[in-house]
């Protein structure tokens, strides 16, 4: 059966709606799910889904057949962030936070599966921390890394964990994939992440994801 002819504007609108819907459903969506939710004919949804998958914007799970956001979307997100001076926007908030709680604060982003500090505000008189702008850290053992990964699609989290592995840095480091996945869900529920001597002995750190504020 021939695919129904759609106007360019309709096709673009449906493509954007599919991407937005995929981003809102962490467990993934099937062709039928998209068709039902967005009121799009299954044949049209199937064509758009295959095209997005071919270009890396969606990925299809071979086990359940559901579609989830692909890594290409993450690349676009990174490009969008680079066009905005995140540090400039965050710095006044960070300074206010330091004034309120008198603890050194950091701003970090996710880059190639690592957490990278892009800004730091040191609290006066506070114990100096061995951190610096540009420092790269593991995502499974740091509070900031957990916060960054927790709000990604589960497929993206799994891909990063597979790529990076779960290195044991202290006796408290989580090195079990099921346990770290549960930890990410806990972060999403609580709204903050904790590093309880998992990256470095003697250090207890808390992090909140600014994107969730």
What feature does the model see in each segment?
Residues 2-88:
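N-terminal helix-turn-helix
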Residues 13, 20, 53, 119-122, ...:
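Acidic-residue sensor for enzyme active/binding pockets
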Residues 63-163:
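Amphipathic alpha-helical effector-binding/dimerization core
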Residues 90-95, 164-203:
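Short, basic/aromatic recognition patches
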Residues 206-213:
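Conserved small/polar residues in nucleotide/adenosyl-binding loops
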């Amino acid at each position: 059966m021939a695919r129904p002819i759609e106007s360019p504007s309709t096709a673009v609108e449906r493509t954007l709606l599919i991407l937005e819907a995929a981003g809102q459903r962490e467990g993934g969506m099937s062709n039928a799910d998209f068709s039902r939710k967005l009121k799009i004919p299954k044949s049209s949804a199937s064509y758009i889904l295959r095209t997005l998958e071919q270009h890396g914007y969606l990925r299809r799970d071979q086990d359940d057949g559901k579609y989830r956001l692909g890594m290409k979307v993450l690349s676009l997100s990174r490009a969008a962030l680079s066009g905005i001076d995140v540090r400039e926007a965050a710095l006044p908030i960070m300074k206010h936070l330091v004034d309120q709680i008198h603890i050194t604060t950091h701003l970090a982003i996710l880059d190639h599966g690592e957490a990278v500090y892009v800004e730091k505000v040191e609290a006066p008189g506070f114990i100096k921390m061995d951190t610096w702008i540009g420092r790269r850290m593991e995502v499974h053992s740091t509070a900031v890394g957990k916060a960054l990964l927790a709000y990604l699609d589960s497929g993206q989290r799994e891909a990063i964990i597979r790529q990076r592995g779960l290195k044991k840095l202290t006796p408290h480091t989580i090195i079990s994939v099921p346990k770290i996945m549960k930890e990410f869900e806990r972060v999403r529920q609580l709204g903050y992440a904790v590093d309880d001597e998992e990256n470095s002995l003697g250090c207890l750190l808390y992090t909140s994801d600014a994107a969730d504020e």
